[in-house]
Structures are given as C-alpha cells and as structure tokens.
Design a protein with these regions (language model features):
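Short alpha-helix plus adjacent loop in nuclease-associated cores
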Residues: 90-95
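Ribokinase/PfkB-type carbohydrate-kinase core domain
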Residues: 1-9, 71-84, 96-180
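Short, glycine-/polar-rich solvent-exposed loops and beta-turns at beta-strand/coil boundaries
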Residues: 86-88
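Glycine-rich phosphate/adenosyl-contacting loop at the front of the ribokinase-like
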Residues: 1-58, 63-77
Length: 180
C-alpha cells in the first residue's frame, strides 16, 4: 500500500508551568522543543510500522526544519518539497500548558505551508494520483484543498487539525474516505 501525506512539519515549543496561570504574568516552568505537525506525526507513525509513505511538505532552511526532515528520511520517508526558499522559517507551534499539563493556549505560524499551494500541487498531481491513499491536513489553504478534492482520484483521508480549520472540509464531507 502506497500512501502520500500532504501537510506540515512543525517545530513544537511546549511550555508547562507548575503554577496557576495568571494573565499578564511570567510563570516558571519547563519548555520542551520537539518535532510536530499533524501530518508529520502521521508520517512518522506510518514509517515506523513500515508503510510505504511519501510526504509533501515544506520546511525552512533553519536547524529544526532540516533536522526533522532528515529524521523522517532516515526512517525511509520519501519527501517531496517545493523549491527551497529563504522567505519563511519552518512552521512553529507554541503551546502553553497549565499545571495539569492541559493546553490552555496555543499559537501556530504555518506561513511556509503557503508554498504547498494549488499551483504547486497541480505540478505534482499526476504523481499524487499514483498512490493508493492521499492524506491531507487542514493547514493547507482552501483553494489547495478544493483542488485536491477535484483532481485526486484516490481515497482522501483528512485530519481536520483543529475546530477552526475543520470548516475547510465541510463542503467535501461526501468525498472524504476517513475523517479525523
């Protein structure tokens, strides 16, 4: 089974405090940096169970983006990316967790994912259609998601990522093979 995943790699910064969160205050705690991104996490898990997986993504020329890309390649993942650019850093996700470890706030910058746009996808659509399954996340813009549903002739699996981004899939519900 051949699977192609289209979406983002994030550099996740996760801050957790041991104290009650108070607005406008600095809180002692711990900060961890880790590889993330819904699509990247799925790709890693598929590779670890020895599935044939290809990843369409975009990373910046920064240390973490290049490292996380290299880590996936070492697992046997084939990566397809738009041409390199200095315009963007890799996607960054910042979460603030409370003392119970529950995420209270998060902010994400996925500007680099704009390189995986309708025009770029149209240049590789024939390749995409050679796979058995196509998995997308909703970090892609609406035009790109619409184009994929119009042109892909294989089952499309979607991860909605968040409540806010899930609305991008509403008009395609009847075409989605699996939705998470």
């Amino acid at each position: 089974m051949k699977i192609i995943v289209i979406g983002s790699i994030n550099v996740d910064y996760i801050g957790t405090t041991e104290y009650e969160l108070m607005f406008g205050e600095s809180h002692p705690g711990s900060i961890h940096i880790q590889a993330g991104g819904v699509a990247r996490n799925i790709v890693e898990n598929l590779a670890r169970v020895k599935e044939d997986v290809t990843f369409v993504t975009a990373v910046g020329n920064d240390f973490y983006g290049q490292k996380y890309k290299s880590d996936l390649e070492e697992l046997g993942v084939k990566i397809i990316m738009p041409k390199k650019t200095e315009q963007y850093n890799s996607s960054i996700y910042l979460a603030i967790n409370d003392k119970e470890g529950q995420m209270v706030y998060s902010v994400v910058n996925t500007d680099i994912v704009s390189l995986i746009n309708k025009e770029y996808i149209s240049s590789i659509i024939d390749t995409i259609n050679t796979f058995d399954y196509v998995l997308i996340d909703t970090n892609l813009d609406n035009d790109t998601i619409d184009y994929l549903f119009e042109k892909v002739n294989k089952p499309i699996i979607c991860d909605a990522v968040s409540t806010i981004k899930a609305d991008k899939l509403r008009k395609h519900l009847n075409k989605i093979y699996i939705l998470k």
